[in-house]
Swiss-Prot record:
Listed Basic and acidic residues bias regions: 458-468
Protein name per the record: Transcript termination protein A18
Subunit description: Interacts with G2. Might be part of a transcription complex composed at least of G2, A18, and H5.
Keywords carried by this UniProt record: ATP-binding, DNA-binding, Helicase, Hydrolase, Late protein, Nucleotide-binding, Transcription, Virion
Length: 478
């Protein structure tokens, strides 16, 4: 159980450092999720993970006793690259120190996209030799964990059919590793069971959870805290440090040649009645999350055609071979899918539709293909999509925050036989109402990709459309 105590000024100040002036929410002694104000005389459950960092004074020692040993006799360490071994060495040294100083054995592995967090975590799982729960945000990530866990030769159970089905299964069967989706944690009985019978908890893609919200995961970490806990992420959420406060971050030296290709095109103005109606919502509360910006962008036929022509040309000439085209809306996704199918057929073009239960099988089939165009949404492909062979990313949407951008670009930052990785951006629109918004969001993508992820920006290229010359010569001037 987390520590239930009053929060003095020093600890309150320490916790607020992670919140960027946002309010601090914790469970009070009555187990209600409430805002914590300074100098409060009330008691709150303080997540033990915050004490994993030696900069935070302990309220009381944390004695970690792990009794749930793995049962597989032939547990095997998976092979690691030298940099992954360095992470393991740092983590194990830190964990020994935590054990000896009576601090919780909690650590965030802040490692870049493509580093191999999954295999590194599985190695640590074998190091601890304790039964483990691996928690993922959605079913899409289960396949890559299954493949990594199999390398350890530990017994495992994958739960995709709901927590009630899993609980029935656990009555007659046990396993060293449980792979679950996070919504299982809404079941209190299940939370207590894994707290009692499993010692290690691995939270994949931890940035996808805001632990300042009253969620199933927040409750689990507060009332059923694991004995050993790892958060895995390439883009850590600062507020989550309150639940897992120690971080290991090893910079990856990559041999990848990462280029950012910006395709400029100066269009004639384009509009339709549909666009004009949607444009009326741009400066209203209805566009709070820029949904109408994306809806209008999906209707930008000249820009859409430019994207299709650019990708088709590069694909035909073999300049790109394994391409992912990413949009925000399903309507936009099906538009591009249909266009590319017209050009190349279904032997080369695939749809990453989150609503299609067969999509995971499609993704698995792409691992063996030499050439393909995969069209999907940022929601489906932004986090956890595991196709290491991807060599090109085509970003068709606009509205992405820095975390989403980094996760999306991470799809083409994986080490593979292709060392050349290309990201395509299309910063122009034929629709004047969203011209400045598109430019603003594109600059954000450029900034994250070049300043943070090491992409090299190529000279801007494209076509400049001159209306007068177009009419005179019936041709486009490059």
């Amino acid at each position: 159980m987390s520590v239930c105590s009053e929060i003095d000024y020093a600890l309150y100040t320490e916790l607020k450092k992670f919140l960027n002036s946002q309010p601090l929410f914790l469970f009070n002694a009555d187990k209600n999720f409430v805002e914590v104000v300074p100098s409060s005389s009330f008691k709150f459950y303080i997540p033990i993970g915050v004490f994993s960092n030696s900069d935070v004074a302990l309220i009381r020692p944390v004695h970690t006793t792990c009794t749930n040993h793995i049962e597989s006799a032939d547990a095997t360490f998976p092979n690691l690259y030298p940099l992954q071994k360095r992470v393991v060495a740092e983590v194990t040294t830190s964990m020994r120190q935590k054990l000896s100083t009576h601090r919780p054995m909690y650590m965030t592995l802040h490692l870049s996209c493509g580093f191999g967090k999954t295999i590194t975590a599985c190695y640590l799982m074998v190091v601890h030799r304790r039964k483990t729960v691996i928690c993922v945000p959605n079913k899409m990530l289960i396949h890559q964990w299954k493949a990594a866990v199999e390398l350890t030769k530990l017994s495992y159970i994958i739960s995709t059919d709901g927590v009630s089905v899993l609980l029935k299964q656990l009555r007659t069967k046990t396993a060293d590793v449980l792979i679950i989706v996070s919504r299982h944690l809404s079941n209190d009985y299940f939370c207590k069971k894994i707290h009692d019978e499993y010692d290690t908890f691995i939270l994949d893609e931890s940035h996808m959870y805001n632990l300042m919200n009253n969620s199933a995961l927040t409750k689990f970490l507060t009332f059923y805290p694991p004995r050993i806990c790892y958060f895995l992420t390439a883009t850590p959420r600062l507020a989550n440090r309150i639940y897992c406060n120690d971080v290991v971050n090893v910079l990856k030296v990559s041999t990848l040649m990462k280029r950012l290709k910006i395709v400029e095109y100066f269009f004639e103005p384009y509009s339709t009645e549909c666009i004009r109606q949607m444009a009326k919502h741009l400066n209203t509360e209805n566009n709070k999350y820029h949904i109408y910006t994306e809806k209008i962008l999906a209707e930008d036929l000249p820009r859409n055609n430019l994207i299709v022509d650019t990708v088709s040309r590069e694909f035909k000439h073999g300049l790109v071979e394994r391409v992912i085209v990413v949009v925000k809306l399903r309507k936009h996704m099906t538009f591009f899918y249909d266009k590319f199918v017209e050009e190349f057929g279904t032997d080369y073009v695939y749809l990453g539709d989150a609503k299609n239960k067969d999509t995971s099988a499609v993704v698995k089939s792409l691992l063996q293909k030499k050439k393909f165009i995969f069209v999907s949404t940022s929601h489906y492909s932004g986090t956890g999509l595991d196709i290491p062979s991807l060599d090109s990313l085509v970003i068709c949407c606009a509205v992405l925050n820095s975390m989403q951008i980094e996760q999306l670009l991470g799809r083409v930052c994986r080490e593979s036989e292709s060392v050349k990785k290309t990201v395509f951006l299309f910063p122009n629109t034929s629709i004047r109402e969203i011209k400045h918004s598109l430019g603003f969001f594109t600059e954000r993508i450029v900034s994250v990709s070049t300043d943070k992820l090491g992409f090299q920006q190529e000279g801007k290229e494209g076509t400049k459309e001159e209306p007068a010359l177009t009419k005179a010569f019936s041709s486009q001037i490059r």
